C-alpha cells in the first residue's frame, strides 16, 4: 500500500488539492485529505503534477505501428502490449481492441488472445470489440466484403460462450434477427449498431431487441432525410442509447459534432478508431487486406 501525494487531483467532479490517493494491490482504495493518511504509509510525492482518470478508447484497431487485424501473426498478445504502451503516451489507459470483419478462425484466435492477455494484464484492455462480420455490404467501409456475412447459430453460440472476454459486437440491425441480438445481450455483450443501412423502423427494432450503442456516429450510416430519419435519426430519438463519434474534422463535420452533442449529451463519447500510424512514424500499413497510406494526417488507399 502507498499514497500518491502533492498532486492536483481531477476526479471528474471536483478538483482536489491537499489530498492523497491511496493505492492497495494495484487498485485505488480511496481519496482522502493528507491529514487523514495512515501513519507510516509510503508516500510518493508527485511534485504538483496533475492526477486525472485515463482516457478509455472503445474503438481501436491499432496504434504504435501495429494492428490487431488481418493476420494470425498480428492478432497476438504482443500486438496488444505494444498498443497499450502507445496508448499510455497520450493518456489512454484502457481500451477495446477492435477486430474488424474477418474469418471465423481469426475471430476465434482474437478471443483466445484476448483471454490470454487479460489473464496477465487485468486493468488495461477491457475486452474485445468485434466490428463485424454481420454488416450491411452497402455500408461496409474498409471492411473486406468477402467476409461480410449473416450470423450462423454455431458462431453466435461460441461468442456468447466467451462473453466474459467479448465486450462489444458491432452489427447492422437490419441484417440480424432480433432474437440473435437478444441472445448476445442476454450473454452480457454490448451490441452496437454500425456499418448499417437501416431505416428508422429497422433501427428501432434492433434497439428494442437490446442494442445499446452505436458505432462511429454518422460514418457508414444512411443520411437523414425529411421522410426517413434512418439510423442516425433513430439514434437521436433514443435518449438512453450511447454512441461513439470520431472527432478529427475529417470523418465528421464539426457542425454535426456540435449538433450530436446537443442532442445526445453525456451519451456521446469520443473514439479514435485509430490504426497503426497513431503514435508511430510509419507511412503505410496493411488493413483489411489493402495497403493504406498515411499522408498529411489522413489514411488513404
Regions inferred by a protein language model and the residue ranges of each:
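N-terminal metal-binding scaffold of metallo-dependent hydrolase/deaminase domains
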Residues: 1-37
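Divalent metal-coordination and catalytic microenvironments
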Residues: 7, 21, 26, 48, ...
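Divalent metal-dependent hydrolysis catalytic cores, especially in the metallo-beta-lactamase
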Residues: 61-64, 81-110, 123-136, 163-174, ...
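Charged helix-capping and loop-helix junction motifs
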Residues: 78, 110-113, 152-153, 227-232
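Active-site-adjacent C-terminal substructures of enzyme catalytic domains
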Residues: 202-301
Amino acid at each position: 500500500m502507498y499514497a500518491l501525494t502533492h498532486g492536483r487531483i481531477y476526479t471528474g467532479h471536483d478538483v482536489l488539492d491537499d489530498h492523497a490517493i491511496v493505492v492497495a494491490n494495484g487498485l485505488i482504495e480511496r481519496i482522502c485529505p493528507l491529514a487523514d493518511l495512515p501513519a507510516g504509509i509510503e508516500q510518493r510525492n508527485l511534485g504538483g503534477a496533475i492526477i486525472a482518470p485515463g482516457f478509455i478508447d472503445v474503438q481501436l484497431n491499432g496504434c504504435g505501428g501495429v494492428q490487431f487485424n488481418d493476420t494470425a501473426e498480428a492478432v497476438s498478445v504482443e500486438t496488444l502490449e505494444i498498443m497499450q504502451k502507445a496508448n499510455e503516451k497520450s493518456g489512454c489507459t484502457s481500451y477495446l481492441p477492435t477486430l474488424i470483419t474477418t474469418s471465423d478462425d481469426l475471430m476465434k484466435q482474437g478471443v483466445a488472445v484476448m483471454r490470454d492477455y487479460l489473464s496477465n494484464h487485468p486493468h488495461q484492455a477491457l475486452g474485445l470489440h468485434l466490428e463485424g462480420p454481420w454488416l450491411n455490404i452497402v455500408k461496409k467501409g474498409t471492411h473486406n466484403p468477402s467476409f461480410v456475412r449473416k450470423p450462423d447459430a454455431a458462431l453466435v453460440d461460441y461468442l456468447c460462450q466467451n462473453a466474459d472476454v467479448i465486450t462489444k459486437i458491432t452489427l447492422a440491425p437490419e441484417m440480424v434477427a432480433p432474437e440473435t441480438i437478444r441472445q448476445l445481450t442476454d450473454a452480457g455483450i454490448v451490441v452496437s449498431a454500425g456499418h448499417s443501412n437501416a431505416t428508422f423502423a429497422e433501427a428501432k427494432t434492433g434497439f428494442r431487441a437490446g442494442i445499446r450503442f452505436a458505432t462511429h456516429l454518422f460514418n457508414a450510416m444512411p443520411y437523414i432525410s425529411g421522410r426517413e430519419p434512418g439510423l442516425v435519426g433513430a439514434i437521436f430519438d433514443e435518449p438512453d442509447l450511447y454512441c461513439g463519434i470520431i472527432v478529427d474534422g475529417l470523418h465528421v463535420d464539426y457542425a454535426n459534432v456540435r449538433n450530436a452533442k446537443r442532442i445526445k449529451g453525456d451519451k456521446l463519447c469520443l473514439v479514435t478508431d485509430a490504426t497503426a500510424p497513431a503514435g508511430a512514424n510509419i507511412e503505410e500499413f496493411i488493413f483489411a487486406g489493402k495497403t493504406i497510406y498515411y499522408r498529411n494526417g489522413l489514411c488513404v488507399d
